[in-house]
């Protein structure tokens, strides 16, 4: 009898081991595990460990919360009403999870790169030898970076492993489009979307190289007329060992590609990946962490974090209703979507291209900056379409606390004004109680280096980049979000330019001071009314390139006599300035198209040192000597401005010394 009972108990234990860890996370595979910095203790949470591996998921096709996933019902691995997929992860958690603060920061990695800990804490992104000041760990946070992009490039990229789709067992074909503006003469270009040293997405190879629907065009700027390049002048090929050989991932052009021109290609592709499962991965991992006590990173609260591409991903997750899990419960309790502007993205389409954004001279006319833009319902006066970003989450009662934060660049390069203004550009709009919008003035998309310097290669601009740091705002935002969700302590109020106050204006009203030798832009990015065919709202794009309708209005922050923006959250470098910081930087003539804006970059324009310098250069801005009688006076005013930011909870008190030091460094830099 005892033997029989033991056998039954063993069988029950075995069967339990086969059950999913949670309804939609079926298992977790840990590939590596180790203590952070040799077992060093971090605050009350003590020793932290870093884990890598893969999470396995399964979703029910019939569940209403999954039915927006494009082609889910056509997945090749559909079995018994379920579709399985998996995703890479990196987790950093207290070794004794009971010592954590209960809050999980769930990073949606930008093109597969886990970077939030390096950004917030400093040090190595992988904590290999340097954890910076370990702010996140000292404060007990858990951090997970989860793959969601199926085609992320790079050996270290965190990826989504999703099935392809077939229609009744037959191959699905379609048209795919890409574009590029070379920064130097090139004989060939790779298919896919690659930015800044090969980061991006591989996208799809050409399926039928000789199909007459494959086209290549060239034009001089975004809205210029396309010129068709004869098919005899180009082919899908690349040079290998001095010989031209066929390639399904490259285009070779006789005579080469010229810098400063936009080349756009359309070609036939096959076997679409069910890319929308990336939304399900983020959603279901968040729910798993909150509801399964045996989760690898158990949490009471989960905050989705995304920067740029992944900030757009989080905006789209909200819009498409993916913050409700399969049980209808809230997945993410808070969302920090940074530098997403007005964008969403190509995340849940047939033949989705998740790396594509909307840069000034590439990734043009993609389904990125598309209506609706505001969190509350609005109306497009041209199309008559109505809606808001939070419509579905509100109807499902799963709207999280939200920070939409942007820098000066997003108003010029990502149409950020559309998130808080009417679609006709004539008025401000009210925000949801769940939302805060923060505009960090003078910063660029990604913080530039200090001392300031120009970019390189395709990032070479006419001016040095804006060096203002985002790090300190990030730390305060995470602390504010945690307090808002945990104890309902309101965060700082929204801070952004407004039409009613005259601080959000048209390009014609932009009061830029005429600084000698500095070229200003005469256009800014905005949203387009696009038509990709009759089924594109259901995720199937059939017209490439799309039909383009009227543009949405372009509005930008107004500036003062120095060229610095009036409204928003102003670092002391803006309140007590030594320079002008902009959200734009024009392309250097050496890389072509010198009248166009660079992607991602702002400008740093120091004031003249003395009245004599000012007079010599005819600079309209006051000199440093006319503003400040001494270094001590400057630093005193700098500290006062900083203390006001700390009082208003934009900056943490512990970061005061580091920011004052930056003020000291900038004074030394501009007065040397």
In which residue ranges do the predicted regions lie?
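N-terminal secretory signal peptides that target proteins for export/translocation
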Residues: 1-5
């Amino acid at each position: 009898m005892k033997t029989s009972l033991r056998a039954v108990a063993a069988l029950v234990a075995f069967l339990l081991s086969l059950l999913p860890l949670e309804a939609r996370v079926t298992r977790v595979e840990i590939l590596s595990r180790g203590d952070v910095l040799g077992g060093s203790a971090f605050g009350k949470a003590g020793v932290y460990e870093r884990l890598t591996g893969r999470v396995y998921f399964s979703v029910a096709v019939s569940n209403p919360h999954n039915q927006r996933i494009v082609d889910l019902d056509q997945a090749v691995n559909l079995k018994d009403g379920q579709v399985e997929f998996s995703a890479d992860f990196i987790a950093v958690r207290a070794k004794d999870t009971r010592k954590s603060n209960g809050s999980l920061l769930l990073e949606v990695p930008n093109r597969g790169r886990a970077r939030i800990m390096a950004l917030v804490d400093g040090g190595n992104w992988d904590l290999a030898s340097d954890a910076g000041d370990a702010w996140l760990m000292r404060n007990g946070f858990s951090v997970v970076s989860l793959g969601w992009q199926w085609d992320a490039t790079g050996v270290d990229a965190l990826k989504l492993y999703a099935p392809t789709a077939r229609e009744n067992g037959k191959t699905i074909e379609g048209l795919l489009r890409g574009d590029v503006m070379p920064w130097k003469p090139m004989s060939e270009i790779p298919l896919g979307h690659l930015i800044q040293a090969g980061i991006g997405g591989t996208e799809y190879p050409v399926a039928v190289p000789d199909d007459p629907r494959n086209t290549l065009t060239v034009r001089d700027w975004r809205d210029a007329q396309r010129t068709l390049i004869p098919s005899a002048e180009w082919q899908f090929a690349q040079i290998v060992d001095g010989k031209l050989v066929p390639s399904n991932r490259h285009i070779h052009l006789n005579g080469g590609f010229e810098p400063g021109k936009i080349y756009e290609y359309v070609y036939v592709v096959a076997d679409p990946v069910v890319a929308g499962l990336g939304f399900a991965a983020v959603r279901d991992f968040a729910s798993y962490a909150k509801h399964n006590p045996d989760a690898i990173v158990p949490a009471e609260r989960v905050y989705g974090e995304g920067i740029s591409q992944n900030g757009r991903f989080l905006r789209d997750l909200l819009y498409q209703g993916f913050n409700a899990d399969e049980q209808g419960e809230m997945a993410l309790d808070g969302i920090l979507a940074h530098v997403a502007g007005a964008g969403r993205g190509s995340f849940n389409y047939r033949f989705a291209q998740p790396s594509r954004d909307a840069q000034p001279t590439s990734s043009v006319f993609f389904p990125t900056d598309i209506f609706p833009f505001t969190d509350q319902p609005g109306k497009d006066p041209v199309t008559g379409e109505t809606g808001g970003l939070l419509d579905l989450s509100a109807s499902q009662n799963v709207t999280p606390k939200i920070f939409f934060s942007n820098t000066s660049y997003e108003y010029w390069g990502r149409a950020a004004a559309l998130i808080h203004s009417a679609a006709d550009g004539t008025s401000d709009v009210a925000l949801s109680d769940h939302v805060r919008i923060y505009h960090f003035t003078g910063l660029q998309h990604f913080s530039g280096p200090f001392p300031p310097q120009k970019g390189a290669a395709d990032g070479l601009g006419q001016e040095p980049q804006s060096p203002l740091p985002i790090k300190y705002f990030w730390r305060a935002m995470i602390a504010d979000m945690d307090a808002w969700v945990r104890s309902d302590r309101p965060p700082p109020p929204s801070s952004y330019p407004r039409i009613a106050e005259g601080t959000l204006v048209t390009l014609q009203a932009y009061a830029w001071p005429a600084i000698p030798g500095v070229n200003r832009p005469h256009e800014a990015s905005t949203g387009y009314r696009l038509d990709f065919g009759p089924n594109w709202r259901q995720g199937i794009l059939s017209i490439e390139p799309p039909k383009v309708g009227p543009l949405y209005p372009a509005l930008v922050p107004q500036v003062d006599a120095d060229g610095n923006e009036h409204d928003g959250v102003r670092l002391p470098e803006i309140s007590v300035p030594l320079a002008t910081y902009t959200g734009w930087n024009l392309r250097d003539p050496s890389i072509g198209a010198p009248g166009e804006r660079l992607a991602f970059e702002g400008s740093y324009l120091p004031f003249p040192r003395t009245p004599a310098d000012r007079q010599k250069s005819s600079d309209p801005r006051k000199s440093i000597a006319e503003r400040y009688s001494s270094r001590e006076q400057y630093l005193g005013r700098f500290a006062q401005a900083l203390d006001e930011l700390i009082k208003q909870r934009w900056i943490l008190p512990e970061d005061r010394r580091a920011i004052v030091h930056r003020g000291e460094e900038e004074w030394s830099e501009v007065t040397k």
